[in-house]
Amino acid sequence: MDDILTTLSVFWLSALVFYVLVHRGLWIFTDVTRTMSMFTLEKALGPGIDLVEGRKGSAPRAWIMQSVLWLFVGAIFTFEGLWLNHEPDALHALSSWGYNPTAETLSATGEIVTLWGGIAMALIGSGMYVLPKLLGTDLASEKNATLVSFLWTFSIVVYMIGSQNSEILGLDIMMIGTGINVIALLAVIMNQLLTLSNRSGSIPMPAWLIIFGLVSDPLSLIAAALTGSLTTGAGQWLVYHMIGGGFFFLSTAGVVLYATTVVSGNALWSRTLNGAILIGGLFTINTFGDIDGSIAAAHLGLAAEEMVFSGGADVTASFLLAMSAIPVVAFAANSLITLRGGDALLENYNGWSEINLGSLAIIPIFLASLFLQTDAVTGTNAIGGMSSTIETMALWAVMVPLSFGSAMALYPSITGRRLASMARARQAFWLMSVGVLLGLMVTLMSDVIGMALMDAGVEDPS
């Protein structure tokens, strides 16, 4: 059995055990652990828990508001990275302050801030509203969830510093940020599991998507650590994509599918497709993201190893990458048909346009990402020059519209207020969609031209 399949087998087994524990329940898990967990979430924190309010909806609101701020910061760094990629000396004046940014560092910072600050916080915040609604209960601890949002924000600040300067005073800054982030994530998981234990009925499929999205992050790391994959390039690549397919894709699917029912007023078009999304998200390898595992290695304080697949691992990885088309197509079909069901086009509803854009864009960007990943896995590396632009497209044309479209659709219900201006929301949508699609398409054409020049033996103009 190759390393890829070994790691995935451990992950699949742990996911199955988790499902059995949650679905059937154990008396020691529901009685003793619940009491201890509630104590840990609130009273164990002492006076610190009184710094935040515990009103209903305060936690989702805090997470979503901070995600908006991080999205703004991520957009700035992403733009500056693209700018320096075409004009390396554009920010040369900053060297007088001792700061010498490069396109690579700014792009990396933009990706981290957008992904973990903007998108992840929007998904977690929306999930804190969606899960209790689906389960007919309240969030276990609004106070703890609100307080943890600031801890998560602090981890993003550390990430942002670490992406610019990875080591300060001999300390690995990225690893410190990961440690803080893991603590915050474990608190979120504990809070949501306690919410799940207080349910009044069965668990709907979107709730399973959100729960598995949260727990797949630590389960992926545990599986890779147990099999020793974290020290290999292929293992680092796998962990990166397992988290992408679990935490980000499944969480997005759960939140978006609920939001589409809110936007359209229709029931989900197909429950069968929901099952395909969950099983496919767990049992395949997500294609979106980088073509190596350097980012995962940096987050874990490890040296980035060369990505080498041996023992048939490349065949396994390529097959599972191709099979990930099933959950992606199932998600796009279910969300779009639910959104447009009954021939009711609600373009003015909060988040309708954003969810529609993300659901439409996910298929072509998935195909582009699939070609990139299989090209890298097989060692061909013929189109690797487009990876950065395709990755940025996946963030800004798919993940950002889906996560923030859902947040916009749910935010009025969370706060009990209306959006300040629908006109501004519409303007923001057109600016984002036109800017992302047009700007990145031009950048993609530039990448293709650059690869053609390099293949022809012409000096790289950049």
What does each of the following model-derived ranges do?
Residues L230-A234, A298-E306, T378-N381:
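Membrane-interface helix termini and inter-helical loops of multi-pass transporters
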Residues G265, H299-V315:
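Alpha-helical multipass membrane-protein architecture
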Residues A234-M242, M307-G311:
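Loop-rich catalytic cores of soluble enzymes, especially ATP-dependent carboxylate-amine ligases
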Residues L45-A59:
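Cytosolic juxtamembrane amphipathic/interface segments immediately preceding
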